[in-house]
A protein has these predicted regions:
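N-terminal flexible segment immediately upstream of the FAD-binding catalytic core
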Residues: 14, 20-43
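Active-site cavity-forming subdomains of large catalytic enzyme subunits
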Residues: 42-217
Length: 217
């Protein structure tokens, strides 16, 4: 790293002392890739996949392959992708949900490693109100249908404060299809809670899909 630093000689010496004294250490991509021609120095690239086949295949798969090729770690939100059973107007069919696409992403990480230095690294995020959340939480299990498993990537569940309140009160929680609640993913705090309650009322009235289950069992 020192050989590719720019600036005064004093700055280079100060940085070297930090490294030598083990008071500071750069991320793995920086250590691996400094002074190389193409590889990335950032630990992770964040992205969001929208609810369209174009976004899923281009942003969620193809572009991630290029970033992984040059040693970039990946972290992305897949909440906007509609859940299993959702109606697809363009084909008059039903969605298979987010899980099969995450399986593709997992295999892409295996196929395109980080510049041959280490395996691809990625993490997919899903919010707790998404209809596929239970299958999502099973993705890394060693049992079950391997076509619905992703052993080579990490998963993370975004949990809103409202879910914790419902859990503490032993109340119910409602799952939605993300294409029917398109703004929920962009809200947080009191704005999220207000909108979530509104969508629950719509689900009770049969205006949108809603699956109710205990917040804690």
């Amino acid at each position: 790293i020192t050989r590719c630093l720019v600036g005064s000689e004093m700055c280079i010496r100060d940085r070297y002392r930090l490294y030598k004294g083990r008071r500071f250490c750069s991320s793995t991509p920086t250590l691996f890739n400094s002074a190389t021609h193409h590889s990335q120095l950032s630990s992770c690239y964040l992205y969001k996949v929208d609810d369209s086949i174009e976004s899923i295949m281009q942003r969620g798969i193809a572009e991630n392959a290029y970033l992984s090729k040059w040693a970039g770690g990946l972290g992305g939100s897949w909440t906007a992708v509609r859940g299993t059973g959702s109606y697809i107007q363009g084909t008059n069919g039903e969605s298979q949900g987010v899980i099969p696409f995450l399986k593709l992403h997992n295999d892409q990480l295996v196929a395109v490693n980080q510049g041959g230095k280490r395996r691809g690294s990625g993490c997919a995020y899903l919010e707790s109100w998404h209809t596929d959340i239970l299958d999502f939480l099973d993705l890394r299990k060693n049992t079950g249908d391997d076509r619905r498993r992703a052993h080579d990537m990490n998963t993370a569940n975004w949990i809103p404060d409202l879910f914790m309140k419902r859990m503490e009160a032993r109340e119910d929680w409602t799952l939605f299809r993300s294409n029917e609640v398109p703004d929920l993913h962009d809200l947080y705090g009191s704005a999220f809670e207000q909108r979530y309650h509104e969508y629950e009322e719509k689900a009770k009235n049969g205006e949108i899909f809603g699956k109710t289950m205990p917040a804690i069992e």
